[in-house]
A protein has these predicted regions:
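Long, histidine/aromatic-enriched segments associated with O2/redox biology
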Residues: 1, 21-267
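Short, small-residue-biased leader/transition segments that mark boundaries at the very start
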Residues: 5-20
């Protein structure tokens, strides 16, 4: 299995990448290994207005680099080595937009844990599941934005949808911020955070604009609670206003083993 041998890059590597496994793939590939406690097939979350769909996919390669050519080169190697073994179902090319903004014009990832909060603690499994310590639960969703509807909103209304100022990223005051603002419903507690690695993507000729959500977490319970707050509401019905303009067309849970474990799995 070539993809198991390429997970550990040389220390001088210029770009990071991650190999991730869905529950069914883990069962088939590593039947003797045991399994991360929370790795299971994602069950859709259906609210009154919006649905976090569940879609298939056994493997995910998350490739990042400052130069798109490096991403292409590495993806080409993966594709060549896995020919006849897997069937590609999706390939999304993200890009950095306007100093970290999403396509909708607001800074993305502001709510990530700060450096002094130790992001590693929120993103990586610890000794609570010792056999898989150093790994991470990774949930991905591909969101398509209705840019016509979004751009029809005045900036002040867009800011109420997100809960932050558009041009300086300052959070709205509690008096200004609606209960269903995006950053209100996704804030489920200071001790319940994830690390986002979201990227915008676009195909202008097709009128397709979106955000590829990638959330790394030490426990999927946190991510699911966040999704339930967005799609069902807490209280029920107080759903994320951003979902009126953004539709999730995929939804899959993966697990990223640590470098050391993945090396062992590939032996």
């Amino acid at each position: 299995l070539f993809f198991l041998m390429i997970r550990r890059p040389p220390r001088s590597t210029l770009f990071p990448y991650t190999t991730l496994f869905r529950s069914d793939a883990w069962n088939r590939l590593f039947p003797e290994q045991g399994k991360p406690k929370e790795l299971k097939t994602f069950e859709e979350i259906k609210g009154e207005k919006h649905t976090a769909v569940s879609t298939p996919g056994d493997l995910l390669f998350h490739i990042r680099a400052k130069q798109m050519g490096l991403c292409f080169e590495f993806a080409s190697i993966i594709d060549e080595k896995l020919q006849g073994v897997v069937e590609p179902v999706d390939e999304t090319h993200g890009f950095r937009y306007m100093d970290g903004k999403a396509i909708i014009g607001f800074v993305d990832g502001t709510e990530n844990p700060a450096v002094d909060e130790n992001p590693y603690h929120f993103a990586v499994v610890g000794e609570e599941d010792a056999d898989f310590a150093g790994g991470s639960y990774v949930f991905v969703q591909k969101y398509i934005h209705d840019m016509v509807a979004w751009n029809s909103l005045p900036v002040e209304e867009q800011e109420k949808v997100i809960g932050r100022r558009k041009f300086n990223d300052v959070e709205l005051s509690d008096e200004e911020k609606p209960q269903n603002a995006h950053n209100a419903v996704t804030n489920i507690g200071d001790d319940l955070k994830i690390v986002r690695a979201n990227m915008p993507f676009a195909n202008t000729s097709k009128g397709e604009y979106g955000t590829y959500f990638i959330g790394y977490a030490s426990t999927f319970t946190t991510t699911r609670q966040m999704l339930e707050s967005m799609f069902i509401g807490n209280p029920v019905g107080n759903t994320d206003r951003l979902l009126d303009f953004s539709t999730a067309v995929t939804g899959t849970l993966f697990f990223a083993p640590s470098y050391d474990l993945l090396s062992e799995l590939g032996e």
